[in-house]
From Swiss-Prot:
InterPro entries: BH2638-like_sf (IPR023324), UPF0223 (IPR007920). This is UPF0223 protein SUB0967. HAMAP family: UPF0223. Belongs to the UPF0223 family.
Length: 92
């Protein structure tokens, strides 16, 4: 995994939408690199889903992000739902 990777962003998104998607992806990064609050990750995911309403686009973003970073948005969200409250880590 490289420390320098690209985020899967859509050029048609507004600045606010890009900021919200980046916030979600940063929460996923925190889950792998340190610890993240499950509620904060799920809240950022909720906002992300308001922007990315298509399941196929969500899966594409997850694939692209995991390919470039090694981090899975799907696994992070599943773990946050499992934990519900408090902090968790997916660090290796």
């Amino acid at each position: 995994m490289s420390d320098n990777y690209n985020y899967p962003l859509d050029i048609n998104w507004s600045t606010d939408e890009i900021t919200s998607v980046l916030h979600f992806l940063n929460q996923v990064e925190k889950a792998y690199e340190s610890k993240v609050d499950a509620n904060q990750l799920l809240e950022s995911y909720r906002v992300f889903k308001e922007i990315v309403t298509s399941k196929s686009q969500e899966k594409q973003i997850d694939r692209e992000f995991e390919k470039s970073s090694g981090y899975s948005t799907y696994r992070a969200v599943q773990k946050a739902k499992e934990v519900e409250k408090g902090y968790f880590s997916l660090g290796r």
